[in-house]
């Protein structure tokens, strides 16, 4: 039995998710989306994770909707890079740090 639906992979917010979200909602399934935040999220979501990317920065409306942030840590400068671009403390939601998997053996990333 499905307990939650997570929409992720590529960039899900480039699609109009209204109909999908509606169909999931009438089945009482919670909906979680993970997005870079650069495109408007069309459709009602229960949880929004913003994982920002340099090539497509999050738009303000999505920063306000975020339930959490996921920052990919590629090297020792990654955290400072993103804190210079986004005021995570002011937004006030959890921020998770994830090592970039190709760098996961690099202790400076951990």
Residue ranges and their predicted role:
Residues 4, 13-110:
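Conserved AdoMet/S-adenosylmethionine-binding subsite of the radical SAM
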Residues 1-7:
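Glycine/small-residue-rich loop that forms an oxyanion/phosphate-binding "nest" at active or ligand-binding sites
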